[in-house]
Amino acid sequence: MSQKYLFIDRDGTLISEPPSDFQVDRFDKLAFEPGVIPELLRLQKAGYKLVMITNQDGLGTQSFPQADFDGPHNLMMQIFTSQGVQFDEVLICPHLPADECDCRKPKVKLVERYLAEQAMDRANSYVIGDRATDIQLAENMGINGLRYDREILNWPMIGEQLTKRDRYAHVVRNTKETQIDVQVWLDREGGSKINTGVGFFDHMLDQIATHGGFRMEINVKGDLYIDDHHTVEDTGLALGEALKIALGDKRGICRFGFVLPMDECLARCALDISGRPHLEYKAEFTYQRVGDLSTEMIEHFFRSLSYTMGVTLHLKTKGKNDHHRVESLFKAFGRTLRQAIRVEGDTLPSSKGVL
């Protein structure tokens, strides 16, 4: 799993910047920006790692002696640490603009190692700062930038923006047999649009979204002139991949789910979003098809989905009516998925520290 980073400016963003000389060189000049500590703690809990990056003009020269900088800076760091705020690294450019160095923001010299790491989640990493140079740094790094402002975009606003859940994924899967486009919104409900070319399968997929409490859009063009095998199988693979991506780092999810009765049927579903693909399936049908869906492909669908989603899935149903038996499986899976993907906290539900 890739890591989310926040590259945060110091003066004017974490602490106030004195308007007289723009230097925090005395203890009485040290003042934290409103709400910064609780919001940094909130962001850490949401899985972000923090990196401080700052330009300190002429640091170590007569105009800004190192000792004058060190006292307030060290006190600031001690306060952050005492409150649980941990910075992975503090990056400082000590040069003046006239020095034309290669490490001054918005140049990327100081952050080169992060850019070289494949593990950085660029889509969900940010530069946060109060100056245009901070936003330019974000552009140069190829990540997002947030322009801090006490009134327009303050720390509580930033914390809310970066921790608000809107888990989404878009997967496109093209083969010689099928062209599949899947979009999933785990934190939005209703409005699903599904078109696989297999009407009863569309109805079953809609049961997953409806009872799972999320929205999805699925468009499939498959080789139905042969049969429904590739369409059902590849849809399962694409949907499983989309669900896995949308779950992200899985922080705070319930992870497990169970259940469901339906008329004369009793369907049992147990789900663990474990990262370990496995399917146990037991269902018997009287006929080879329900509507235009082959009953033998139902197990194949769930096996494909569990494989790409990385879940342990147990499914079982008993009943008299094939339509009800099939529908009970999809409803049970959807209802169980609703429980498992629900967010209840901000910790990873695993003693191993990884899912």
Swiss-Prot record:
CDD domains: HAD_HisB-N, IGPD. Its EC number is 3.1.3.15, 4.2.1.19. GO terms for molecular function: histidinol-phosphatase activity; imidazoleglycerol-phosphate dehydratase activity; metal ion binding. It holds the Pfam family Hydrolase_like. Keywords: Amino-acid biosynthesis, Cytoplasm, Histidine biosynthesis, Hydrolase, Lyase, Magnesium, Metal-binding, Multifunctional enzyme, Zinc. It comes from the Bacteria. The keyword Magnesium applies. This is Histidine biosynthesis bifunctional protein HisB. It comes from Escherichia coli O6:H1 (strain CFT073 / ATCC 700928 / UPEC). The gene is hisB.
